[in-house]
Protein backbone atom coordinates (compact mmCIF):
# COMPACT_ATOMS: atom_id res chain seq x y z
CA UNK A 1 0.00 0.00 0.00
CA UNK A 2 2.97 2.32 0.29
CA UNK A 3 2.59 3.53 -3.30
CA UNK A 4 -0.80 4.99 -2.41
CA UNK A 5 0.35 7.49 0.15
CA UNK A 6 3.01 10.14 0.11
CA UNK A 7 3.08 12.99 2.59
CA UNK A 8 3.87 16.34 1.11
CA UNK A 9 6.23 18.20 3.43
CA UNK A 10 4.32 21.34 4.30
CA UNK A 11 7.01 23.93 4.67
CA UNK A 12 7.46 25.74 7.96
CA UNK A 13 6.63 22.66 10.04
CA UNK A 14 8.84 24.05 12.80
CA UNK A 15 6.03 26.44 13.65
CA UNK A 16 3.87 23.52 14.76
CA UNK A 17 6.43 21.36 16.54
CA UNK A 18 10.02 22.14 17.57
CA UNK A 19 11.20 18.87 16.00
CA UNK A 20 9.58 19.90 12.71
CA UNK A 21 10.95 18.12 9.66
CA UNK A 22 13.13 15.79 11.73
CA UNK A 23 10.08 14.25 13.42
CA UNK A 24 8.25 14.14 10.09
CA UNK A 25 11.13 12.41 8.31
CA UNK A 26 11.50 9.82 11.07
CA UNK A 27 7.77 9.09 11.16
CA UNK A 28 7.66 8.72 7.38
CA UNK A 29 10.54 6.26 7.35
CA UNK A 30 9.14 4.19 10.24
CA UNK A 31 5.78 3.93 8.48
CA UNK A 32 7.22 3.20 5.03
CA UNK A 33 5.89 6.48 3.63
CA UNK A 34 7.91 8.50 1.09
CA UNK A 35 8.78 11.94 2.44
CA UNK A 36 8.98 15.18 0.45
CA UNK A 37 11.17 17.94 1.87
CA UNK A 38 10.22 21.48 0.90
CA UNK A 39 12.83 24.13 0.17
CA UNK A 40 11.20 26.40 2.77
CA UNK A 41 11.98 24.37 5.87
CA UNK A 42 13.58 24.85 9.25
CA UNK A 43 16.03 21.95 8.95
CA UNK A 44 18.82 21.45 6.44
CA UNK A 45 18.70 18.96 3.58
CA UNK A 46 21.39 16.87 5.22
CA UNK A 47 19.83 16.78 8.71
CA UNK A 48 16.50 15.61 7.31
CA UNK A 49 18.24 12.91 5.28
CA UNK A 50 19.97 11.65 8.42
CA UNK A 51 16.66 11.55 10.29
CA UNK A 52 14.97 9.76 7.38
CA UNK A 53 17.66 7.07 7.27
CA UNK A 54 16.80 4.37 4.75
CA UNK A 55 13.41 5.94 3.97
CA UNK A 56 12.38 7.12 0.53
CA UNK A 57 12.72 10.89 0.23
CA UNK A 58 12.14 13.46 -2.49
CA UNK A 59 13.17 17.09 -2.67
CA UNK A 60 10.56 19.77 -3.40
CA UNK A 61 12.17 22.73 -5.13
CA UNK A 62 10.89 26.25 -4.76
CA UNK A 63 12.69 27.43 -7.85
CA UNK A 64 14.84 30.59 -7.73
CA UNK A 65 14.95 32.83 -10.79
CA UNK A 66 17.44 32.12 -13.58
CA UNK A 67 19.87 34.73 -12.28
CA UNK A 68 20.23 32.59 -9.16
CA UNK A 69 20.85 29.34 -11.00
CA UNK A 70 24.05 28.71 -9.03
CA UNK A 71 21.96 28.47 -5.87
CA UNK A 72 19.54 26.09 -7.59
CA UNK A 73 22.42 23.87 -8.72
CA UNK A 74 23.83 23.86 -5.19
CA UNK A 75 20.51 22.73 -3.71
CA UNK A 76 20.12 19.99 -6.32
CA UNK A 77 23.64 18.73 -5.72
CA UNK A 78 23.10 18.68 -1.96
CA UNK A 79 19.81 16.82 -2.31
CA UNK A 80 21.27 14.23 -4.66
CA UNK A 81 24.28 13.66 -2.41
CA UNK A 82 21.95 13.23 0.59
CA UNK A 83 19.91 10.50 -1.08
CA UNK A 84 16.83 12.31 -2.34
CA UNK A 85 15.71 10.29 -5.34
CA UNK A 86 13.13 12.49 -7.10
CA UNK A 87 12.74 16.22 -7.69
CA UNK A 88 9.32 17.81 -7.19
CA UNK A 89 9.20 21.27 -8.78
CA UNK A 90 6.64 23.73 -7.42
CA UNK A 91 5.22 25.75 -10.31
CA UNK A 92 2.39 27.70 -8.71
CA UNK A 93 4.02 29.52 -5.80
CA UNK A 94 6.83 31.65 -7.22
CA UNK A 95 4.80 34.46 -5.66
CA UNK A 96 2.25 34.15 -2.87
CA UNK A 97 -1.42 34.51 -3.76
CA UNK A 98 -3.81 36.96 -2.14
CA UNK A 99 -4.44 35.28 1.21
CA UNK A 100 -6.76 37.33 3.45
CA UNK A 101 -6.57 34.92 6.37
CA UNK A 102 -2.77 35.00 6.34
CA UNK A 103 -2.84 38.79 6.28
CA UNK A 104 -5.43 38.94 9.07
CA UNK A 105 -3.21 36.73 11.21
CA UNK A 106 0.00 38.56 10.38
CA UNK A 107 1.35 35.43 8.71
CA UNK A 108 2.69 37.31 5.69
CA UNK A 109 4.04 40.80 5.35
CA UNK A 110 1.69 43.36 3.76
CA UNK A 111 4.13 45.65 2.00
CA UNK A 112 1.76 48.48 1.15
CA UNK A 113 1.09 49.15 4.84
CA UNK A 114 4.53 50.70 5.23
CA UNK A 115 3.37 53.92 3.58
CA UNK A 116 1.96 55.33 6.84
CA UNK A 117 3.17 55.52 10.43
CA UNK A 118 0.32 53.27 11.54
CA UNK A 119 1.15 50.93 8.69
CA UNK A 120 4.78 50.83 9.81
CA UNK A 121 3.70 49.86 13.31
CA UNK A 122 1.39 47.17 11.98
CA UNK A 123 4.15 45.89 9.72
CA UNK A 124 6.46 45.49 12.72
CA UNK A 125 3.72 43.54 14.46
CA UNK A 126 3.11 41.37 11.40
CA UNK A 127 6.81 40.67 11.02
CA UNK A 128 6.90 39.19 14.51
CA UNK A 129 4.62 36.46 13.15
CA UNK A 130 5.90 36.30 9.57
CA UNK A 131 7.55 32.85 9.45
CA UNK A 132 10.48 34.01 7.34
CA UNK A 133 11.27 36.95 9.60
CA UNK A 134 11.00 35.29 13.01
CA UNK A 135 14.02 35.21 15.32
CA UNK A 136 14.01 31.41 15.29
CA UNK A 137 14.58 31.38 11.50
CA UNK A 138 11.59 29.22 10.60
CA UNK A 139 11.69 28.19 6.95
CA UNK A 140 15.19 29.38 6.07
CA UNK A 141 17.53 26.58 7.16
CA UNK A 142 18.25 25.29 3.66
CA UNK A 143 19.38 28.72 2.53
CA UNK A 144 21.38 29.53 5.64
CA UNK A 145 23.21 26.21 5.30
CA UNK A 146 23.83 26.57 1.56
CA UNK A 147 27.45 27.46 0.72
CA UNK A 148 26.59 29.25 -2.52
CA UNK A 149 23.86 31.38 -0.96
CA UNK A 150 26.11 32.22 1.98
CA UNK A 151 29.01 33.20 -0.29
CA UNK A 152 26.80 35.41 -2.44
CA UNK A 153 25.25 37.02 0.63
CA UNK A 154 28.69 37.87 2.00
CA UNK A 155 29.86 39.20 -1.35
CA UNK A 156 26.77 41.42 -1.62
CA UNK A 157 26.66 42.72 1.96
CA UNK A 158 30.23 42.39 3.17
CA UNK A 159 29.43 40.26 6.21
CA UNK A 160 28.30 36.75 7.17
CA UNK A 161 24.66 35.69 7.50
CA UNK A 162 25.08 35.32 11.27
CA UNK A 163 25.91 39.01 11.61
CA UNK A 164 22.42 40.00 10.44
CA UNK A 165 20.18 36.96 10.49
CA UNK A 166 17.05 39.01 9.81
CA UNK A 167 18.56 40.28 6.57
CA UNK A 168 19.71 36.78 5.62
CA UNK A 169 16.28 35.31 6.32
CA UNK A 170 14.56 37.98 4.24
CA UNK A 171 16.98 37.53 1.35
CA UNK A 172 16.45 33.77 1.34
CA UNK A 173 12.69 34.25 1.29
CA UNK A 174 13.09 36.51 -1.72
CA UNK A 175 15.28 33.90 -3.40
CA UNK A 176 12.80 31.03 -3.18
CA UNK A 177 9.74 33.23 -3.79
CA UNK A 178 11.29 35.38 -6.52
CA UNK A 179 8.10 36.81 -8.04
CA UNK A 180 9.26 35.56 -11.44
CA UNK A 181 7.87 32.49 -13.16
CA UNK A 182 9.84 30.05 -15.28
CA UNK A 183 9.19 28.94 -18.85
CA UNK A 184 8.82 25.43 -20.24
CA UNK A 185 12.27 25.83 -21.78
CA UNK A 186 13.79 26.33 -18.34
CA UNK A 187 12.94 22.74 -17.37
CA UNK A 188 15.85 21.63 -19.54
CA UNK A 189 18.14 23.30 -17.00
CA UNK A 190 16.76 21.05 -14.24
CA UNK A 191 17.06 17.98 -16.46
CA UNK A 192 20.70 18.85 -17.06
CA UNK A 193 21.48 19.13 -13.36
CA UNK A 194 19.22 16.39 -11.94
CA UNK A 195 19.62 12.81 -13.15
CA UNK A 196 16.58 11.37 -11.36
CA UNK A 197 12.83 11.63 -11.96
CA UNK A 198 11.39 15.14 -12.23
CA UNK A 199 7.78 15.78 -11.17
CA UNK A 200 6.11 19.11 -11.97
CA UNK A 201 3.66 20.15 -9.25
CA UNK A 202 0.77 22.50 -9.99
CA UNK A 203 -0.59 21.14 -13.28
CA UNK A 204 -4.27 22.03 -13.69
CA UNK A 205 -4.99 21.82 -17.43
CA UNK A 206 -4.86 19.14 -20.11
CA UNK A 207 -2.75 21.41 -22.31
CA UNK A 208 -0.09 21.80 -19.63
CA UNK A 209 -0.15 18.08 -18.90
CA UNK A 210 0.49 17.34 -22.58
CA UNK A 211 3.34 19.84 -22.55
CA UNK A 212 4.87 17.94 -19.64
CA UNK A 213 4.88 14.81 -21.78
CA UNK A 214 6.44 16.75 -24.63
CA UNK A 215 9.36 18.06 -22.57
CA UNK A 216 10.03 14.64 -21.06
CA UNK A 217 9.39 14.90 -17.33
CA UNK A 218 8.50 11.71 -15.50
CA UNK A 219 5.48 12.86 -13.51
CA UNK A 220 3.08 15.63 -12.59
CA UNK A 221 1.04 16.57 -9.54
CA UNK A 222 -2.49 17.73 -10.33
CA UNK A 223 -2.66 20.43 -7.68
CA UNK A 224 -4.02 23.90 -6.98
CA UNK A 225 -1.83 24.31 -3.88
CA UNK A 226 -4.71 23.48 -1.61
CA UNK A 227 -6.86 26.21 -3.16
CA UNK A 228 -4.70 28.84 -1.47
CA UNK A 229 -3.16 30.57 -4.47
CA UNK A 230 -6.02 31.55 -6.83
CA UNK A 231 -9.43 32.33 -5.39
CA UNK A 232 -12.10 30.65 -7.49
CA UNK A 233 -9.64 28.42 -9.31
CA UNK A 234 -10.92 25.08 -10.57
CA UNK A 235 -10.64 22.20 -8.12
CA UNK A 236 -7.88 19.69 -8.71
CA UNK A 237 -10.28 16.77 -8.32
CA UNK A 238 -12.43 18.14 -11.16
CA UNK A 239 -9.42 18.27 -13.47
CA UNK A 240 -7.88 14.95 -12.43
CA UNK A 241 -9.89 12.58 -14.70
CA UNK A 242 -9.45 14.82 -17.74
CA UNK A 243 -5.70 14.95 -17.24
CA UNK A 244 -5.46 11.21 -16.56
CA UNK A 245 -7.35 10.49 -19.79
CA UNK A 246 -4.97 12.73 -21.72
CA UNK A 247 -1.57 11.67 -20.35
CA UNK A 248 -2.04 8.92 -17.77
CA UNK A 249 -0.43 6.32 -20.01
CA UNK A 250 2.59 8.52 -20.71
CA UNK A 251 3.72 9.72 -17.27
CA UNK A 252 2.88 9.32 -13.60
CA UNK A 253 -0.10 11.40 -12.47
CA UNK A 254 -0.11 12.26 -8.76
CA UNK A 255 -2.74 14.26 -6.91
CA UNK A 256 -3.01 16.66 -4.00
CA UNK A 257 -5.15 19.51 -2.64
CA UNK A 258 -7.83 18.68 -0.12
CA UNK A 259 -7.04 15.12 0.97
CA UNK A 260 -8.39 14.86 4.51
CA UNK A 261 -9.44 11.23 4.92
CA UNK A 262 -9.16 7.75 3.48
CA UNK A 263 -12.35 8.18 1.45
CA UNK A 264 -10.76 11.16 -0.30
CA UNK A 265 -7.80 8.97 -1.23
CA UNK A 266 -10.14 6.30 -2.60
CA UNK A 267 -11.89 8.84 -4.84
CA UNK A 268 -8.64 10.22 -6.21
CA UNK A 269 -7.29 6.75 -6.93
CA UNK A 270 -10.55 5.77 -8.60
CA UNK A 271 -10.24 8.81 -10.85
CA UNK A 272 -6.80 7.67 -11.95
CA UNK A 273 -4.24 9.16 -9.58
CA UNK A 274 -1.20 6.98 -9.06
CA UNK A 275 -0.45 8.47 -5.64
CA UNK A 276 -1.96 11.03 -3.26
CA UNK A 277 0.10 13.64 -1.46
CA UNK A 278 -0.99 14.90 1.93
CA UNK A 279 0.03 17.97 3.86
CA UNK A 280 -2.31 19.49 6.39
CA UNK A 281 -3.54 16.23 8.00
CA UNK A 282 -0.06 15.19 9.03
CA UNK A 283 0.65 18.70 10.29
CA UNK A 284 -2.30 18.29 12.66
CA UNK A 285 -0.74 15.09 13.97
CA UNK A 286 2.69 16.68 14.23
CA UNK A 287 1.32 19.65 16.16
CA UNK A 288 -0.63 17.56 18.64
CA UNK A 289 1.64 14.57 19.11
CA UNK A 290 4.95 15.02 17.35
CA UNK A 291 6.35 11.96 15.62
CA UNK A 292 3.80 9.66 17.26
CA UNK A 293 1.00 12.00 16.21
CA UNK A 294 2.13 11.81 12.61
CA UNK A 295 2.25 8.03 12.76
CA UNK A 296 -1.32 8.05 14.07
CA UNK A 297 -2.43 10.16 11.09
CA UNK A 298 -0.75 7.80 8.61
CA UNK A 299 -2.36 4.75 10.16
CA UNK A 300 -5.75 6.43 10.37
CA UNK A 301 -5.71 7.45 6.72
CA UNK A 302 -4.65 4.00 5.58
CA UNK A 303 -7.13 2.32 7.91
CA UNK A 304 -10.02 4.40 6.63
CA UNK A 305 -8.97 3.75 3.04
CA UNK A 306 -9.02 0.00 3.66
CA UNK A 307 -12.40 0.19 5.43
CA UNK A 308 -13.83 2.29 2.61
CA UNK A 309 -12.81 -0.32 0.07
CA UNK A 310 -14.14 -3.18 2.20
CA UNK A 311 -17.51 -1.55 2.83
CA UNK A 312 -17.88 -0.56 -0.82
CA UNK A 313 -17.23 -4.14 -1.92
CA UNK A 314 -13.99 -3.23 -3.70
CA UNK A 315 -11.47 -6.05 -3.61
CA UNK A 316 -8.27 -4.01 -3.89
CA UNK A 317 -6.85 -0.58 -4.64
CA UNK A 318 -5.68 -1.79 -8.04
CA UNK A 319 -7.23 -0.19 -11.09
CA UNK A 320 -8.96 -3.43 -12.02
CA UNK A 321 -11.16 -2.91 -8.97
CA UNK A 322 -10.83 0.74 -7.87
CA UNK A 323 -11.77 2.78 -10.91
CA UNK A 324 -14.45 5.14 -12.18
CA UNK A 325 -17.00 2.35 -12.40
CA UNK A 326 -17.37 2.48 -8.60
CA UNK A 327 -18.10 6.21 -8.53
CA UNK A 328 -21.41 7.99 -8.93
CA UNK A 329 -21.50 11.69 -9.77
CA UNK A 330 -23.75 13.78 -7.57
CA UNK A 331 -25.29 15.32 -10.68
CA UNK A 332 -26.40 11.85 -11.82
CA UNK A 333 -28.15 10.96 -8.56
CA UNK A 334 -31.23 13.12 -8.97
Where are these regions (language model features)?
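Conserved beta-strand segments that form the floor/walls of ligand-binding pockets within enzyme
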Residues: 6, 199, 221, 254, ...
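Extended hydrophobic/aromatic segments used for targeting, binding, or gating
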Residues: 45-46, 210-213, 217-255
Amino acid sequence: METLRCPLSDHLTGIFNPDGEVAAARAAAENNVPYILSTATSTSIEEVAEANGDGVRWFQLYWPKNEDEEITISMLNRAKKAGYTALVVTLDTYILGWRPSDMDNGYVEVHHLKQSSLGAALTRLFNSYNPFLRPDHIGTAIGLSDPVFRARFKQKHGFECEQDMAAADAEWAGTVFPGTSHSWEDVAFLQKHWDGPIILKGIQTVADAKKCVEIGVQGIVVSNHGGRQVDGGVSSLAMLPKIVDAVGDKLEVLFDSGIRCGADIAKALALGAKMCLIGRPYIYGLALGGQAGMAHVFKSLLGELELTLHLAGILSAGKEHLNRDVLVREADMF
